Structure formats: structure tokens, C-alpha cells
Swiss-Prot record:
Top-level taxonomy: Bacteria, Bacillati, Bacillota, Bacilli, Bacillales
Organism: Listeria monocytogenes serotype 4b (strain CLIP80459)
Role this protein plays: Involved in the catabolism of L-rhamnose (6-deoxy-L-mannose). Catalyzes the transfer of the gamma-phosphate group from ATP to the 1-hydroxyl group of L-rhamnulose to yield L-rhamnulose 1-phosphate.
Alphabetized InterPro entries for the sequence: ATPase_NBD, FGGY_C, FGGY_N, Rhamnulokinase
Disulfide bonds: 352-369
Annotated protein name in UniProt: Rhamnulokinase
Residues bound to substrate: 79, 234-236, 294
Superkingdom of source: Bacteria
Length: 483
């Protein structure tokens, strides 16, 4: 029996999940979990990438302690951030977080030189200041000139483990630098940044064998001899693979620090309507596209908890929220002011004051406001997706940590007026494992993998119901007019 390890690292935590296929069912075991985050150093918010590597080795040592001497391994992380590699293969600096303020106004500045419509027609990717395109636009020229390669975070981890440099496609597409038609890094865009296309590793599809873990790591650490497979390295791409969807006319919501809501399509949509609504066409596994919108997600709730010194668990916060009427206050969860404020609680209160609403005071009121606003935003985006794609959406599959928030799931079902299916919460790691298993011949296809997922995990169901959607939508429109 083969053993598979998913290295799944998000913006706030990481984990190593051991998986195996037994009687056509996936069995998972969490081996190691660790915190992730950025710290302010050398003038920027930076990821502790060396510490992340140490946590991976700690997790792999725990796998070996279970008596497993050989395994298959895949890596997925958050997107857009990168490591610059020098001529000798060394890391030139710790990677800067997408939440760093260096890209403020970068979209505006770059698109004043290079038209938005032109960039969107080429890439099909939504405009966000955190995109790699804008990070590289403001990167230190000296570092860029010294860099031989630019590797996104999961590709860097794979490189450290195996010595092989690649640019996996699902994650590379989030850079806003891949040309949809040519299926390559766009030379014109890179030329505008004065970056040679050769600084990027060869584009590699999800499901490709990468290589074996280097001998030096087997000697330094007591870890299994691992075959590394390049999975869908963008965590959302893996989460979509791990979605237990069946049939047609469904949408997905990967709900975690970010909310990513969209549809899996066989071809991108980069027409005027998609451009106007700032939709993105991220590449998916096995020739698919993730037509989606990035929405600020549970990050806002996480920050409320942090401002409260974590006195309440997330379950307690949700319970407190249920004591208040929904939609008393509504915020635009995708307003840039909620990206990384000094104090999230104060920012929400100030927003409500500025938009003529009552001010939420308690932890329950604040949480209620955010969950209600998220559900409303999801419903509005599902409406827009239907208009742009011409496809009727009948089901929404919510995966990731947010699938455990029953209140948010039920509110979404009511506002959107469709059935909502919630779970599994570890869809990203599951999708990571499924791609490994397809590579190794244990699972036939992504469709077959999704059937196995449906048979392996409990999926919650939330029915649609009566709610004053049009009235709430009108109130939200008025709130937006204050901005």
C-alpha cells in the first residue's frame, strides 16, 4: 500500500496530512500542524520561509516514526508570493508577504503605463495589488538583477527538497503574467518590467512527477525516501480538485482566510463583462479554468479574534453572533481598508459610522456583521457569475475551514436561493492527495477522485429558504454609495 503526504500551507497555518486509499475510500491522518505568519523585518512584512522548511522536516520525521520508509509527497501553499534565487541556487532574501504595503497604488501606477484592458485580454486575471505582477513592479532592482530564477513559494519548497526548479501552472496563473492564448509567460508584460522571461522556470502542469528528495536531506533528517509530485500547488486549485461536486451547474466556494467563489470551466472567459466585474481565470488542474472572484474571507473574523486577545473561540463567536438580528450592519468585505488595518475592530466600527449605520459594539455584533456581509457578497457574486457565463447555478459546494461555520453556510443558502453542500474542511489537502494518486495510477481521473471524496467524507447540506434578498441588496447598494 502506498502512503501519500500532503504538505498544505496556508497564510495562517500549515499541516502535513498522511493519506491512503483503502477500499475506494480516502483515509486521512494529520501528522503535524504548525502556525504560519509574517513578521516585520528589514522594512517589510516577511514570511519565515526557513522555519516553514524546518516544520516540513519535523512533519516528515513524524511520518518516518510511523514506520513509513517511502512515500509520495505533494506541496500546495497560498499564491502570488515568491523567492528570488541567486546564481548559486541560494535564497537572496526572505519572501515578502502579499499583505505588505509596498504595492499600494501599484495597480494604478502600472496600468497608467500599460492599459488595464490589454493586461486583462492577455491574462484573464483580476486586478489586485497583491498579484505577483505588481510585487515585481515595485521589487528592488538590485535584487531582481541578481536573481537567476523567480520561484513561487510551493515551487521554492519543491526546489529545496529535490533541486528541481519548475513553475507549476495553477499557481503561475495567479501572477497575472501568463498569456491565456500562448499558454506561456507573457514576454511583453515582463519586458515592461525589465524582467527576462528566462528568470522563470519551465511551466509544468499539475500531476507531473518532480523528483526524489535529495540525499543530503535523507542524511541530515530521519525522513522517508519521498517521490515528490507537482500537484495543483495553488491551494485554491487543490481545494477545487478536492470538491465533492457531481453533475453540472455547480459553483465552489473555498472558504478560509480568503473566500474564493467561482465555477470550474473548460475555457476561460475574458470578455468585457468579466473584465468589468474584475473576474479572474486562474488555471486549474487537468486543463480546467477556475473562473472566480477573490473575496476577503475569514481573515476579518480572525483579526477580530486577535483584537479580542483570543478570549473567545471561533465557535463561541458564532454562537454570540446568533443572538443578534442579521444584516443590522453591512460592510463591503472586499474594501481594501480591511486588507491589513492596524485594528480590524476599529476599522469595522469606523466603516459603519461613515456609512450611516449603527455601530457594532460586542464581539457577537461584530461577528454577526461580518458573517452576514460575507453571505451577502457570496450571493451577489453568484448572481453576477450566472449573468456572465450564461450558466444556471443550482448548487454551491463550500470547502475549507469555513465549511464548518454552519451559520455562514445557512445564510449563504438563504440569500443565494440554492442548495449548499459543506465540506470537507480539508479539501485542499485532499485535492493535493488526489492529484498524487492520479499520478501514481491509483485513481483514474479527477471525476473519479471526486466520487471517492463523496464516499469518504460527511458532507453537510443546507437548504435555501425565505429571506429578504432584494431588500438587503438595496441596503448594501446604499452603503456602497457612501464610499
Amino acid at each position: 500500500m502506498k502512503h501519500y503526504v500532503a504538505v498544505d500551507i496556508g497564510a495562517s497555518s500549515g499541516r502535513l496530512i498522511l493519506g491512503k486509499l483503502v477500499n475506494e475510500k480516502l483515509q486521512l491522518e494529520e501528522i503535524h500542524r504548525f502556525k504560519n505568519g509574517f513578521t516585520y523585518r528589514d522594512g517589510h512584512e516577511r514570511w519565515e520561509i526557513d522555519q516553514l522548511m524546518q516544520e516540513i522536516f519535523i512533519g516528515l520525521e513524524k511520518v518516518k516514526q510511523l514506520g513509513i520508509s517511502e512515500c509520495v509527497l505533494g506541496i500546495d501553499t497560498w499564491g502570488v508570493d515568491y523567492v528570488l534565487i541567486g546564481a548559486s541556487g541560494e535564497k537572496l532574501a526572505d519572501p515578502i508577504s502579499y499583505r505588505d504595503k509596498r504595492t499600494l497604488n501599484a495597480v494604478q501606477n502600472l496600468t497608467s503605463e500599460y492599459p488595464r484592458e490589454y493586461i486583462y485580454k492577455k491574462t484573464g486575471i483580476q486586478f489586485m495589488e497583491l498579484n505577483t505582477l505588481y510585487q515585481l513592479y515595485v521589487e528592488e532592482r538590485d535584487l531582481l538583477e541578481r536573481a537567476e530564477k523567480i520561484l513561487l513559494i510551493p515551487d521554492y519548497i519543491g526546489y529545496v527538497l529535490t533541486g528541481v526548479k519548475v513553475a507549476e501552472t495553477t499557481n503561475s496563473s495567479t501572477t497575472q503574467m501568463l498569456n491565456l492564448r500562448e499558454q506561456l509567460f507573457d514576454k511583453d508584460l515582463l519586458s515592461h518590467l525589465n524582467i527576462d522571461v528566462e528568470k522563470f522556470a519551465p511551466l509544468t502542469d499539475a500531476g507531473t512527477y518532480l523528483g526524489k528528495v535529495k540525499e543530503e536531506w535523507l542524511e541530515e533528517y530521519d525522513i522517508p525516501n519521498c517521490d515528490v509530485v507537482t500537484v495543483a500547488t495553488h491551494d485554491t486549485a487543490s481545494a477545487v480538485v478536492g470538491t465533492p461536486a457531481e453533475g453540472e451547474n455547480w459553483a465552489f466556494l473555498s472558504s478560509g482566510t480568503w473566500s474564493l467563489i467561482g465555477m470550474e470551466l473548460s475555457a476561460p472567459i475574458n470578455n468585457e463583462a468579466a473584465f468589468k466585474e474584475n473576474y479572474t481565470n486562474e488555471w486549474g488542474a487537468y486543463g480546467t479554468y477556475r473562473f472566480l472572484k477573490n473575496i476577503m474571507g475569514l481573515w476579518i473574523v480572525q483579526e477580530i479574534a486577535r483584537m479580542d486577545d483570543y478570549k473567545h473561540s471561533f465557535a463561541e463567536m458564532a454562537e454570540e453572533a446568533s443572538n443578534y438580528p442579521y444584516f443590522k450592519q453591512i460592510i463591503n468585505v472586499n474594501d481594501a481598508r480591511f486588507n491589513n488595518p492596524e485594528n480590524m475592530v476599529d476599522e469595522i466600527k469606523l466603516y459603519c459610522q461613515e456609512t450611516g449605520q449603527t455601530i457594532p459594539e460586542t464581539i457577537g455584533e461584530l461577528t454577526n456583521c461580518v458573517y452576514g456581509s460575507l453571505a451577502l457578497y457570496y450571493a451577489l457574486e453568484l448572481e453576477k457569475m450566472t449573468e456572465i457565463t450564461g450558466k444556471k447555478i443550482e448548487k454551491l459546494y463550500i470547502v475549507g475551514g469555513g465549511s464548518n461555520v454552519a451559520m455562514l453556510n445557512q445564510l449563504t443558502a438563504k440569500l443565494a436561493g440554492i442548495e449548499v453542500f459543506a465540506g470537507p474542511s480539508e479539501a485542499t489537502a485532499i485535492g493535493n492527495l488526489v492529484v498524487q494518486m492520479i499520478n501514481q495510477g491509483e485513481i483514474e481521473s479527477m471525476r473519479a477522485g471526486r466520487k471517492i471524496i463523496r464516499n469518504s467524507f460527511e458532507i453537510g447540506e443546507f437548504s435555501c429558504g425565505d429571506v429578504r434578498f432584494e431588500e438587503i441588496k438595496e441596503r448594501f447598494t446604499k452603503v456602497l454609495e457612501f464610499n
